[in-house]
Each structure stands twice: as C-alpha cells, then as structure tokens.
Regions:
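Hydrophobic ligand-binding cavity/cleft-lining segments
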Residues: 1-38
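A conserved amphipathic terminal alpha-helix motif
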Residues: 109-141
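Hydrophobic pocket/interface hotspot
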Residues: 19, 23, 46-48, 63, ...
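Alpha-helical scaffold segments that form or flank carboxylate-/histidine-based iron centers
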Residues: 7, 47, 51, 119-123
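Hydrophobic-ligand binding "helix-grip"
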Residues: 36-39, 54-102, 108-110
C-alpha cells in the first residue's frame, strides 16, 4: 500500500497542456538540468541522469500513469538499480485553476516500511518544491 510521505503544490499561470509539455520535455527544467530518458508510456522504464550538489547521479523507475495534461506518476529510486519493491512513487496531478493550473506533487513510500523524521520530510518537501518552481518558470515562459 502506498503511504503519502510529503505533498507540495503550486499554481502556474499556464494551461494544463503547456504545463504537461514543460513537464515531459527530455531536459525539463523541472529535473534541474538532468536528462530524462523515457518514452512516457505507462509501463516503460526511465533513467534520469544529472548532477546534484556537484555529484553525478542516475535515478531509476517506471512510468505508471501518463494522462496528458492531467496526471503523471512514476516509481523512483535514487541510488542503484534496486528491486521495484524498494522504489518510492511520485504523482503529479494537474488541475485547471482559473486561467492557469494547480499542480500537486505527492511522494509515496512503497515496499519496506520506513519512518521519516521531520528533518527528512522537510528536505523532501524542499527538493520537490524547487522542482515545481522550476516547472512553473518553464511553463510560464
């Protein structure tokens, strides 16, 4: 069962289709300069390669849902290729909001139960908020 770990949201002055296009670009600013290799089809694997705080990384996962302009979800793992039961899940929901969009990102825990302290949850929230801010800037430009 998926357990929500953290949720963040932002309002973007762009229609959902423009938010979707910015979100699914191969070098989406949302991924902070990293490159996402996938075909965005449910069931497809992806790799996200880039640099964070001066260190290279490769993240892994599988696309779960890809409903253009509405919802994107995928599993996520940040260290080495691990079995899927170790992955987190991330869901972006895009809702029309006035002349723009509301985007809600939820990170879920899967697999082995883990307890996250307040400091860790705050770090997750900070990182996801930075990603949404980058998405906002890209979609609004």
């Amino acid at each position: 069962m998926d357990e929500p770990v953290v949720e963040v949201e932002t309002h973007i002055a762009a229609k959902p289709d423009k938010v979707w296009a910015a979100m699914t670009a191969r070098k989406s600013p949302m991924f902070m300069g990293a490159t996402m290799d996938t075909d965005w089809q449910p069931g497809s694997d992806y790799t996200l390669k880039g640099e964070w705080e001066g260190r290279g990384f490769t993240d892994y996962g599988k696309i779960e849902t890809a409903l253009a302009g509405r919802e994107l979800s995928f599993t996520h793992w940040s260290k080495t290729p691990e079995p899927p039961e170790s992955y987190n899940a991330v869901r972006y929901q895009i809702m029309p909001a006035g002349s723009g969009s509301k985007v809600t990102l939820t990170q879920f825990q899967r697999g082995k139960p883990q307890t996250f302290d307040d400091k860790t949850r705050a770090e997750f929230k900070k990182n996801w908020s930075m990603m949404l801010e980058a998405l906002k800037k890209a979609a609004e430009s």
